[in-house]
Structures are given as structure tokens and as C-alpha cells.
Amino acid sequence: MAKRNVTAKKKVVKKNIARGVVYISATFNNTNITITDEMGNVICWSTAGGLGFKGSKKSTPYAAQQAVESALSKAKEHGVKEVGIKVQGPGSGRETAIKSVGATEGIKVLWIKDITPLPHNGCRPPKRRRV
């Protein structure tokens, strides 16, 4: 019988970071939350799909709220107390995600920016759906 090669999981090193940036990427299908330090190094992240929401439930505002709460609870373990928010995308979880960051106890929101890319008449958009 052959020996199985088992790799050990990486141990998460607790960082002591007081100020961070929350990136909220709200697409039509999912919501991604990434929390970084001020230099852009990722502290933790969470997605609606990663929390067990499948299919069309991933794009709901409730799923976005749960993703934010999951990511911020991980960030609090690293000592994050103040955050800025950068929002990208047109998804339905966008507003709810911003509100739930502000409502989280122990986290102070310093600023909110919209970083959604807008084309200056760039690529031709895809044709309209006919249902």
C-alpha cells in the first residue's frame, strides 16, 4: 500500500493592522469582498458563492450582507478598526454591502469611493438578450 502524501495547511499569521480598505465587487451573478491593508496586501476575502449561496441566490442583497459580515469578522482578528470602501460593479448587493460595513460594530468607515470602470466609447457591447 502506497503512502499518501499529505500537505499541511498554511498557518494564518495574525497581522496587527489598524486601517484597511474594503473592496466590494458586485456583479450581476455574485458579490466579492476583499479586505486589504493600505498598501494593497490582501488580509482576507469572502464571496457570496463561497458561503454556500448557489445559483441566482448569490446575487441577492442578503448574500452580499453575509459575505461582508464574514470578511469583516476575519479582518477584526487582524486588528482592523478603520476602513475605506471602494465599490465596483452594478450588482444588486452593492448598496446592502456598503450599509452592512457601516453597521458593523467596531469598524469605522472613513470614506466611500466608486471605482466602476466606464468606457469612453470603447468596445462594442454584446447584443441584447431576447427571452
UniProtKB/Swiss-Prot annotation:
The keyword rRNA-binding applies. Disulfide bonds: none annotated. One of its GO terms (cellular component) is cytosolic small ribosomal subunit. Pfam families: Ribosomal_S11 (PF00411). Signal peptide: none annotated. One of its GO terms (molecular function) is structural constituent of ribosome. Gene3D superfamilies: Ribosomal protein S11 (3.30.420.80). InterPro entries: Ribosomal_uS11, Ribosomal_uS11_bac-type, Ribosomal_uS11_CS, Ribosomal_uS11_sf. Transmembrane segments: none annotated. GO terms for biological process: translation. Keywords: Ribonucleoprotein, Ribosomal protein, RNA-binding, rRNA-binding. Part of the 30S ribosomal subunit. Interacts with proteins S7 and S18. Binds to IF-3. Located on the platform of the 30S subunit, it bridges several disparate RNA helices of the 16S rRNA. Forms part of the Shine-Dalgarno cleft in the 70S ribosome. Belongs to the universal ribosomal protein uS11 family. This is Small ribosomal subunit protein uS11. It comes from Helicobacter pylori (strain ATCC 700392 / 26695) (Campylobacter pylori). The lineage of its organism: Bacteria, Pseudomonadati, Campylobacterota, Epsilonproteobacteria, Campylobacterales. The gene is rpsK.
